[in-house]
Amino acid sequence: MRTAIVAVLIGLAVLVSSFLLGSAFELKGPVAEVVDGVTYSWDAQDFAGFYYDIDDDVGDERLSLAISAGALEDSGAVYATRAQKEMIEFSGWGSRWTIGFLGEAHFAGYCGGYLFDESGSEVLFRDERIARVLVDDDEERTIQRDVPLRLEGGYKLAVKDVNPVGEKVSLELSRDGVRMDSTVVEPSKANATLEDRTYLYKRPIGGEDVVFIAVHFKNAFSGSGDVLVTVDGVWQLSEQTISLREGDEWGEMAVYDLDPDNMTFTMTNEDRKISFSRGRSKVLMSDIGIKTADQDDVDNAINTTTGRPENPLRFRVYREVEDPGTYEIRGHLGKVVNGSTWVWNASSFAGFYYDMDEGLGDESLNLNIAEDRLKGETGAVYTSRAQKNRMEFEDWGALWTISFLGEAHFAGYADGIFRDESENPNMLAEEQLIKVLIDDDRKETFDTDSPLGLEDGYKLSLESVDESGEKVSVALFKDGALMDSAVIEPSRSGATLKDQTYIYSGRVGGADDVVIVAVHFRSAFTTGDDGFAEVDGIWQISDEALFVEEGDDHGDMTVEEVDPGDMTITMMNEKEILLKSDDDLPLLEDIRIRTADQEVINNTINSSTGLPEDPLRFYVYKAVTLEP
């Protein structure tokens, strides 16, 4: 694992393909259901909100929720995490204990090597403390007398002088301009030891001086007035340690056990009942919470065939992220094992679109491993299926919604007035998708002086209302240009749905006379010279189409079939995809495959399990950038 001095969470190669967000977002776990007697478990390999380092296979956070009578009773929620050994990036310094805590990696202590010895064998976890790792890298960089090494937390390490032969380097550590320490290292002297080459800054914890900053010097040079020093290892811990004591509360959870011998830590909701009710978000611990669907059709009646509720309340765990940076929305871990098949779908992989309130979203990705690759046409298969759902103003009917590469799109009118009014209601028949811009049933009043604002430059102007309020003249504009005008009769006796609805149709992509804008008028009236109208349904789709045609390439995948009968889109990889160590593959545009930078890959078959000992690890993911 590397923690760069400049806080960049994922490599620059990913930044160019990531989504940009300007505020907090949620790292979502797989969708689950509130079913009595069921226990759900998530770990670092299937919940992106927990910390996991795929390269070193480090990260062992777990959360289990035992549901009883629609709630989590006393100790029904259990969070456990375990520290694991891993090498410090500059391996000459030895190893450390890393523990995932509430989704982030923390330092639990040194466990062997030079920094362990220099810290008096002190392990923070035994003192009920952990700390953030601010810097851990072994990249070479050159510093000069006038250009100090910038660390985190306002620290700077400056080279004050180098003797003429380059053997002695005088250093000064400062924080926010205040001198904290000074010393001399000797990286270039004959037979220099690790101690000679390493600058250490310590702070007292648990009766011992623990290393908080370490810098390894590769060499030094002084000549002609120039001073150049090369460092190839930097390590820094946060001085703000986190206290973990039995009984401490974190949201609805409390510390239940801290075991320094096994390096484990457990929290439960002891003495606190957590109920599940629809449309709620409940903080469980720190930034990790539980969100339930705002679900209209909850049905807990038991199906006699399955023995399960017909349609129980849906929920998911999540972690809210606010700190700027680039994050990976990753699916569950996979392994490159010959003959294995790995599947991700909309309810298990948050990189796909899923509307938990409506239970809407049907994307799936199957990866079929053959030796160390995905063979052409059969190795990777992506399928998206359109689903029928009602519009917000339900009298208008239903539409086909299809999720494609993680985003929801309009695939056609399934039934109702808009299907009847559209010459080409099925968008998949034209190999195209359209974005829904507005689908709203909120009541809104506008008048002859203030048009109804729509998306993409459209406005609906109320031109006039007759004295009886029966006839309403409207005009539709786009970017100031008149597109359409009509008269509707929302208030006349016996008015039909068509009488009450303004509809604008036009050509979208390859489809003729598709309903683009619709507004339902609830009533209209006049007051003096002013006309007013109340609307309670607005619908708008984009007038530009996204074409999805057979043969189109999306990353390493190609559209194989667009089926307007089954309302599906299928893509496959036409070319073979090799899965090798330390790779980042653009499988489906922004949906990618990351393989581990794995030092040991052992495909020897274990006689007990029948599986390889330590195959190459990978996961699919989508990158999201949170801007400051």
Give the role of each language-model region.
Residues 1-24, 159:
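Secretory targeting signatures
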Residues 22-628:
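Surface-exposed, beta-sheet-biased, low-hydrophobicity segments with strongly acidic/polar composition
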